[in-house]
Amino acid sequence: MSNQDPHHQRDSLFATPIANLGDWRFDERVAEVFPDMIQRSVPGYSNIVSMIGMLAGRFVTSNSQIYDMGCSLGASTLAMRRNIVAENCKIIAVDNSPAMVERCRRHIDAFRSQTPVEVIEADILNIDIQNASMVVLNFTLQFLNPQDRQGLLNRIYQGLRPGGVLVLSEKFSFEDQQIGELLFNMHHDFKRANGYSELEISQKRSMLENVMLTDSVETHKSRLHQSGFNHVEVWFQCFNFGSLLAIKGADE
């Protein structure tokens, strides 16, 4: 994402002690530094985004819709739009953060393309998914109430065309405690290597712990199968971050 906005700022939101941290919010301050924050916090993020573009080239079909659910600043939307060769398609990018939506629209408008994009400020749980050849949940599901996750995946499955794909990227938890601890610590090392201090890491973690509730790969796969997807697999992973593909059967 960092190549989309030459004016993006370095993330120093948590560099000094904050008395009342509260819960994490995707507000104006976060939106302003988001490209830098996500590059330095999520291992493999830029790879996932560029490969989402490659997947769009394979899966997006003519006369269909593409959904980017929890689009933030539109990195996945732009990657998909650059790679879509099918005609008469539309991308619907949704986020519930006004600050993200405003900036996302500016990013989208900065690039010309044959494929129209509609950026909507809304709760993704209220979006009607229809005639979709591709749906992206890029580090979004983990911020939903766990009770709402299965229902959303069910609606995505129902709204996908046969042969359509869901890309689900998440931070993972692990049933094996030793593996979980190792990957947690390696992610900590990753952030430290990217210039974050112990104070920044701990303050951000405190704000996220009540808001971002992660699942294991096994839980994700189980939910996706329960929704109706027959073809489900992890296609990318770096430490405790990764992405799954769920493909709706061509004859379903």
Curated annotation (Swiss-Prot):
Keywords per UniProt: S-adenosyl-L-methionine, Transferase
Positions of S-adenosyl-L-methionine binding: Y45, G70, C71, S72, D95, N96, D123, I124, N138, R205
Family annotation (CDD domains): AdoMet_MTases (cd02440)
Family annotation (InterPro entries): CmoA, Methyltransf_25, SAM-dependent_MTases_sf
A Pfam match: Methyltransf_25
GO molecular function, one term: carboxyl- or carbamoyltransferase activity
GO BP annotation list: tRNA wobble uridine modification
Signal peptide from the UniProt entry: none
SUPFAM superfamilies documented for this protein: S-adenosyl-L-methionine-dependent methyltransferases
EC number(s) recorded for this UniProt protein: 2.1.3.-
Catalysed reactions, as listed in the record: prephenate + S-adenosyl-L-methionine = carboxy-S-adenosyl-L-methionine + 3-phenylpyruvate + H2O
Function noted in UniProt: Catalyzes the conversion of S-adenosyl-L-methionine (SAM) to carboxy-S-adenosyl-L-methionine (Cx-SAM).
Family: Belongs to the class I-like SAM-binding methyltransferase superfamily. Cx-SAM synthase family.
Assembly description: Homodimer.
Name by which UniProt lists this protein: Carboxy-S-adenosyl-L-methionine synthase
Gene: cmoA
